[in-house]
Amino acid sequence: MDSGLGRSSETSLKALPSMASNATRNTDPDQQGVRFSSMDQPPCFARPGQSFPAFPPLFGVQSSSLYLPDDIEAKIGNQFESNPSPNNPTMDWDPQAMLSNLSFLEQKIKQVKDIVQSMSNRESQVAGGSSEAQAKQQLVTADLTCIIIQLISTAGSLLPSMKNPISSNPALRHLSNTLCAPMILGTNCNLRPSANDEATIPDISKTHDYEELMNSLNTTQAESDEMMNCQNPCGGEGSEPIPMEDHDVKESDDGGERENLPPGSYVVLQLEKEEILAPHTHFCLICGKGFKRDANLRMHMRGHGDEYKTAAALAKPSKDSSLESAPVTRYSCPYVGCKRNKEHKKFQPLKTILCVKNHYKRSHCDKSYTCSRCNTKKFSVIADLKTHEKHCGRDKWLCSCGTTFSRKDKLFGHVALFQGHTPALPMDDIKVTGASEQPQGSEAMNTMVGSAGYNFPGSSSDDIPNLDMKMADDPRYFSPLSFDPCFGGLDDFTRPGFDISENPFSFLPSGSCSFGQQNGDS
């Protein structure tokens, strides 16, 4: 079994012309290929009696270098990453940026490993260490979240390269079928050399998983440029970060989706200001009482006689058949200069009367509703006030750059968009209760913060638009990818004794961290 796998691996490696020349220069003349010893055997080949490890469904042959030892990576991985050929059309990503991302992930994993190792060494000291252990657990959770997000972003940069199929090279196809097929398919089956060397790799660019991952990772260029331009250009080392103001506005109520209706296919109606701001739109013809909905008017009419109590009178009026063939009706904002006004060059019509009301109140009316909790934020639509009051007064979610968010999913969206940003921990959670325990707790936290080595370049932000990226609380929510086979599942770590959804991360003080190489002290 071992010799068979060894011969198959030698055959696969010798099939690459560029690898054959390098192997000839770096090995003895009598050696016919690269042999794997029992110590440096790649993880993709199992020893006798040992099951093969499960691989996450990573994309592309380039990802196979993540699972090879250093000596094999120097011979194989650099053929695809470090020396991109201008004649190779499949190399449409930057190898230097990829190496930088992998180095960042390596440092973060080493930091988490050091923290967990320190927790394991001090697990016997139960008395007086509960607050310190809880703070470390929060730090490990935040670091693992950052690692997973950065790993997904790194894998996403490789996805455009999959648009060019690799099946044109028989040797490369055979090597990828032997080493990377389980990683692409996400299976746990044994890796056996295929008898048919002409087997092709499935077109990942057409799969449902590929489309979902691309939709979740890629943000439009306009949104990225707008968010980058919102950074404070004057923010130096001594500048204080400006908290981001969270606007809980639902664009669907405002008719935010832009329609591409051809001209002449719809009729534009423009209501006056008085009609838009009128509290009632339906009135009783007998007593003159007004109502917001026609159903309330029908219920009111029952008090004016038995003829209004019949099923026909209480039923919702049926649509006139003649109106079905009528053109689509859209609405215009009466405010001159607004892009929703029909006189605007880039006119965007509003779909319904409700959209007209919400748009006009939000954009052109005074904000008369004030939050009773913070007494600072004002709204012109009562629904926006109620949405704001749901999270007002709670601890804000903070990023390492100092930007604050009212919701956790928006923080994670911000972290995924800007490289190097991570969720941060509050210093209040690190304080040790008790006067006798405080010196020991402070010293322990200083050691932990120093060993973690966090230091992010300070940056300010002004009204960065919220990236509404809905995420679940489960650590495997990021995409169809599953990281359990690679990381062993986040459940292997000791779960903190708090609810992540109710205890936000805050950030460590500036200047307490650095991504430099550590000395190895845990």
From Swiss-Prot:
Molecular-function GO terms, alphabetical: zinc ion binding
Subcellular location: Nucleus
Compositional bias segments (type: Polar residues): 1-12, 19-40
Pfam families, sorted: zf-C2H2_STOP2_3rd (PF23115), zf-C2H2_STOP2_C (PF23118)
Region (Disordered): 1-43, 234-260
Name the UniProt record assigns to this protein: Zinc finger protein STOP1 homolog
Highest taxon, organism lineage: Eukaryota
GO biological-process terms attached to the record: regulation of DNA-templated transcription; response to acidic pH; response to aluminum ion
Organism: Oryza sativa subsp. japonica (Rice)
Chain intervals with Basic and acidic residues compositional bias: 244-260
Keyword set, alphabetical order: Metal-binding, Nucleus, Repeat, Transcription, Transcription regulation, Zinc, Zinc-finger
Zinc finger (C2H2-type) residue numbers: 282-304, 390-421
Function in brief: Probable transcription factor that may be involved in aluminum tolerance.
GO (cellular component) term, any one: nucleus
